[in-house]
Amino acid sequence: MGSFKTSKYYGFMILFFMVLFFYAIFKFLTPSNFGSLDNIFSYFQSSIIYSVGGCGLYFIVVMGLFDFAVGANIVFSSIVGVILSEKFGYLGFVLGCVGCGTLIGIAIGFLYNSLKVPSMIVTVGLMLVLESLAVFVAGGVKQTLAPELRFFSGAPGNIILAGLAFVFMWFILTYTKIGTYCNAIGSNEFVASNMGINVKKYKLIGFALLHFFVGIMAILTVSYGTTMTALTGMSTMSRNFQPLMGTFFGVAFRKYGTPISAIIIGEFIIAIIFNGFVALGAPTTVQNIVTGAALLVIVTLTAREKRGSVVK
């Protein structure tokens, strides 16, 4: 029985129970406009956008790091991708989003290692910089993705792209040292360093991988919404939190060996909750309350004090 409670099957059982629990609550409260098969498929399609970002955040969150420039990079990379798509079509769109996102991730990792200040401070500063750059690049004009370039706006394009991202993460965690070393650094950075792990190198890799996935998320985001507007004043901050909640599901369920599945299903659970409140006619501010409350609960359940921890 003890081994079953640490198995992936037990983890899946908990996740599916949570899905059924929240679905049943909202289906009971508002049966007429919630939870049809079409609705569920729509919830899933919106949730996989955040799941991709959640997969990227996993690489740094397990090391105890945070990145508040994710939302700003989504906006900036989306704008760059849309502008390049006007001249180079799908190639410019995909490479613009993913390439721009990855380069920004490398820059963030380099600055974090060089400045030696907490990741929150570095990324908040870069968030402000990226927001301003996005306004400059966009020229103050809303960027619209051409209709002929919207393959990733819905099924099957969005599912294929997100699926490739999930497979890529599975490959990294299963067949490379990156996942193991990131976990080791998060458990005890000093011990990991004494074991010969190049801590700075893998933190840089973590940020690069995060923003590679952010680039993919940018493709899905601007395809789904078809437009992107550059805003300043920390307006992109709200884009950070929903993928982060999926990441915390992954961190909480990694003990069952199911981090990727937990991120995907966790984001689906969040989508059910959000859309359930919409079906009830609750004001949009309720979503912010739910987001904040969910973050507090998940962080409380997953955060643990570690001996030998350092300022992140």
Listing of model-derived features with the role each one plays in the protein:
Residues F88-M127, I265-G266:
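Alpha-helical transmembrane segments within multi-pass membrane transporters and channels
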Residues T229-I289:
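Transmembrane alpha-helical segments in multi-pass inner-membrane proteins
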Residues L115, S119-T176, L204-I205, G225-G233:
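Transmembrane helix-bundle core of multi-pass membrane transporters
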Residues M1-A24, V167-M169, S187-K201, F277-K312:
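Cytosolic-side transmembrane-helix boundaries in multi-pass membrane proteins
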Residues F12-L15, I25-F26, F152-I185, N198, ...:
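Alpha-helical transmembrane segments of multi-pass integral membrane proteins
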Residues S32-S42, L210-M245:
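Inter-helical junctions in multi-pass inner-membrane proteins, predominant
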Residues S46, S119-M120, F152-A162, K203, ...:
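Loop-to-transmembrane alpha-helix initiation sites
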Residues F21-L29, S36-E86, G246-G257, A293:
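Single transmembrane alpha-helix segments in multi-pass membrane proteins
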